[in-house]
């Protein structure tokens, strides 16, 4: 019996981590994207041919190629843009707060797990 419980716990662990990461996205990351990025990168406008409404769009990326490499923020174009490290600086104008940048960085490091808050039907906030 104990052994059964042990195996059940093992099987449940990855699912729990996934849920936790999805919640991290919905509560911490999605609000940043909604507020600062979605106005220009949505299904209608697609600035630089990239929309931020789902994970696939970011993995596929825009005219420059993939915007995020899950697990590897240092090689993710999106992070370089947020940090104003290169020619591409996002959002245009003043950079995000250090805290917001670290939240997005942590999210990519943890595998860039998506939640339910942003999807194809999400419309940008006016
Ligand atoms: C005011 C409109 C606007 C906002 C807000 C904005 N972007 Fe952009 N974004 C653009 C434009 C325009 C380009 C194309 C720039 C270029 O090609 O030089 C672009 C390009 C990009 C690219 C490169 C895509 C590619 O493959 O060429 C990334 C990544 C990106 N933005 C991320 C973001 C992120 C992350 C945010 C939010 C923090 C954001 N953008 C907010 C207008 C915007």
Label every PLM stretch briefly.
Residues 4-13:
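Sec-dependent N-terminal signal peptides
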Residues 15-126:
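Aromatic- and Gly/Pro-enriched helix-to-coil junctions and flexible linker segments
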